[in-house]
């Protein structure tokens, strides 16, 4: 039916063009009229066309993406104004900025929906666009309809519908510089007027661009692959079921970073690693591996006066990052971070139908996310000597320099390597209720007013565990009387274990005025509140555990020393370590509050 309509329209346009130009066009002129298929993508929330909304919108069609080689969100930066997603590190580093608003770590400030299903964690934002129909980018806060983490804007990605297109797509790409290669195949089949499906997959790989100066190997190689099944069933004229399931796997080298030299305040002339400045020269491979599973069901029921939509989504992410954190050819310290994430989401919306003067949408949404993170830090030989042993000995040296009459103190760590464990469970629950109404042709034709309000509740918690074990010797050297006192085989066991809880309530209003000069031109003023949700910065635990490590080592010294010496040692340390003896405040260090 759609093809027949397009054929009739093409004939009418061709006839009209011929009638208007038959007397003016030269006889040897050939005029070609190219009409693209019109694809209508419905949204459960918006009550009007995206281009007519009182917000800044960029729409990228599949033709736009193919012409500009858009294969991931990171490529969109070259095409969409005020949008930036830096391409560095790995797929884990998926910070997005719209109008300068974004977040490099923790929760994002820009939201992402794929086929109306939210991607809650930005670790899943970087994926392949092999079967994408359209991308919508809304700039500015979208908190009233979309809630948390849309303070900067919103990205909506739509896969191609097997009802709007049938056939088999095969795409092949090759690039010489990095030996980039990719292939994708997707088949779209319309079984009947009531059922259609698509199934496809892709593979891509690259040898990378950056070489390690130590071994000559490229460090940013990559291989990825995945597939997706999309099925749509129309049991009746007013009921639609849209199901998707997909999996993506990537294994890549990453983090082609290099040492930039000593910062201001350090002795640059006697810098230890001067020869490695500006060179990729780490001695441990940096890698990132991710498995990403997504599935969702969109149910749409069209009643006489409203449209009911129910969207259910589930996401599973398992990844592993290994990083040589010193980025030097020395054994200082490494980190191995693993994430295991499961998210289930549900959203039910009612919106108006066939009502031009008053358009409205009401909805309720919620999700629950389980996230388990492990991030042990391994201090290698140089790290034990320079960072753990060296930092404390530098403090002891400063004590003696400030007061030469005090005894000289030093310690010797006996471990060749020290492992600092880190295990974190950070579940998040969120639910919201919202309504938005638009009144068209208010007072005068072309003037519309949009008002909305969202009430959102969010609850989160963190169970944390981090520990270590250090064996060391301590030495005390007194001048008068000359005396060397060793305290051997001391042991310190720093430990951080506990639970934090936080919850927030947010009201997200919206008010917008729009005047339509014509169907293609309008002017609007919009006031909207957006917010970035709070959470826990587990990366700060490395600083906390190092502080606790120093305290536990000093406590071990004081417990071993005679009572007469213990008081003297503790007094000297307190003058130069003001945080010694103070209880570590985990909440103050790791909890970050919502931003508006």
Indicate where each model-derived feature is located.
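N-terminal periplasmic "start-of-domain" segments of outer-membrane beta-barrel proteins
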Residues: 22, 32-65, 94-95, 110
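Extracytoplasmic beta-strand/coil segments of soluble accessory domains associated
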Residues: 74-117
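Short, polar/charged loop or turn motifs at beta-strand boundaries
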Residues: 53-72, 97-100, 120, 174
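Outer-membrane beta-barrel translocator/receptor signature
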Residues: 94, 108, 121, 130-133, ...
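Structural signature of Gram-negative outer-membrane beta-barrels, strongest in the C-terminal barrel
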Residues: 232-236, 350-353, 365-367, 424-596
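Transmembrane beta-strands of outer-membrane beta-barrel pores
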Residues: 172-178, 203-207, 247-251, 303, ...
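Periplasmic-side early beta-strands and strand-to-turn transitions of outer-membrane beta-barrels
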Residues: 164-165, 173, 190-284, 317-331, ...
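Short acidic/polar hinge/loop motifs at secondary-structure boundaries
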Residues: 115-141
């Amino acid at each position: 039916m759609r093809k027949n309509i397009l054929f009739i329209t093409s004939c009418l346009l061709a006839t009209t063009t011929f009638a208007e130009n038959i007397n003016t066009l030269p006889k040897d002129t050939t005029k070609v009229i190219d009409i693209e298929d019109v694809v209508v993508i419905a949204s459960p929330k918006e009550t009007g066309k995206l281009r007519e909304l009182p917000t800044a919108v960029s729409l990228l069609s599949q033709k736009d993406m193919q012409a500009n080689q858009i294969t991931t969100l990171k490529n969109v930066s070259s095409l969409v104004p005020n949008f930036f997603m830096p391409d560095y590190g790995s797929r884990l580093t998926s910070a997005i900025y719209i109008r300068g608003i974004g977040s490099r770590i923790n929760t994002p400030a820009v939201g992402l929906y794929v086929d109306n299903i939210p991607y809650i964690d930005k670790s899943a934002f970087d994926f392949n666009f092999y079967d994408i129909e359209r991308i919508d980018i809304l700039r500015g806060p979208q908190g009233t309809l979309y809630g948390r983490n849309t303070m900067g804007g919103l990205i909506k990605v739509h896969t191609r519908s097997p009802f709007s297109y049938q056939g088999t797509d095969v795409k092949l790409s090759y690039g010489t510089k990095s030996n980039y290669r990719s292939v994708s195949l997707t088949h779209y089949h319309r079984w009947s007027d009531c059922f259609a499906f698509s199934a496809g997959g892709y593979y891509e790989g690259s040898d990378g661009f950056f070489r390690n100066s130590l071994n000559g190997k490229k460090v940013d190689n990559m291989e990825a692959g995945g597939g997706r099944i999309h099925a749509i069933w129309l049991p009746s004229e007013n009921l639609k079921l849209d199901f998707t399931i997909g999996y993506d796997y990537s294994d890549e080298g990453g983090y082609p970073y290099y040492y930039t030299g000593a910062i201001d305040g350090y002795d640059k002339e006697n810098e230890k690693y001067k020869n490695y400045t500006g060179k990729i020269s780490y001695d441990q491979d940096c890698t990132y591996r991710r498995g990403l599973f997504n599935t969702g069901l969109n149910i749409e029921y069209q009643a006489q006066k409203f449209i009911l939509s129910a969207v259910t989504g589930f996401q599973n992410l398992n990844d592993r990052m290994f990083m040589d954190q010193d980025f030097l050819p020395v054994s200082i310290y490494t980190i191995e971070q693993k994430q295991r994430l499961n998210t289930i989401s549900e959203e039910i919306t009612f919106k108006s139908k066939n009502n031009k003067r008053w358009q409205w949408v009401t909805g309720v949404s919620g999700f629950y996310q389980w996230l388990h993170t492990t991030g042990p830090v391994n201090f290698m030989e140089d790290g034990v000597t320079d960072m753990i042993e060296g930092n404390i000995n530098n403090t002891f040296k400063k004590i003696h320099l400030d007061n030469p009459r005090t005894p000289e103190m030093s310690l010797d760590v006996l471990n060749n390597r020290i492992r600092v464990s880190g295990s974190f469970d950070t579940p998040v629950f969120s639910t919201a209720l919202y309504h938005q109404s638009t009144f068209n042709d208010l007072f005068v034709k072309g003037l519309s007013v949009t008002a909305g309000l969202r009430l959102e509740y969010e609850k989160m918690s963190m169970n944390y565990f981090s520990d270590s074990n250090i064996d060391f010797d301590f030495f005390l050297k007194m001048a008068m009387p000359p005396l060397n006192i060793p305290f051997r085989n001391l042991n310190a066991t720093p430990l951080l274990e506990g639970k934090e809880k936080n919850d927030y309530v947010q009201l997200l209003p919206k008010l917008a005025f729009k005047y339509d000069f014509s169907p293609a031109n309008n002017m609007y003023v919009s006031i909207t509140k957006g917010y970035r949700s709070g959470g826990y910065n587990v990366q700060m635990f490395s600083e906390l555990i190092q502080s606790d490590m120093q305290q536990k080592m000093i406590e071990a010294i004081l417990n071993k020393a005679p009572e007469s010496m213990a008081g003297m040692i503790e007094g000297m340390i307190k003058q130069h370590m003001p945080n010694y003896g103070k209880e570590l405040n985990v909440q103050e260090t790791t909890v970050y509050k919502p931003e508006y």
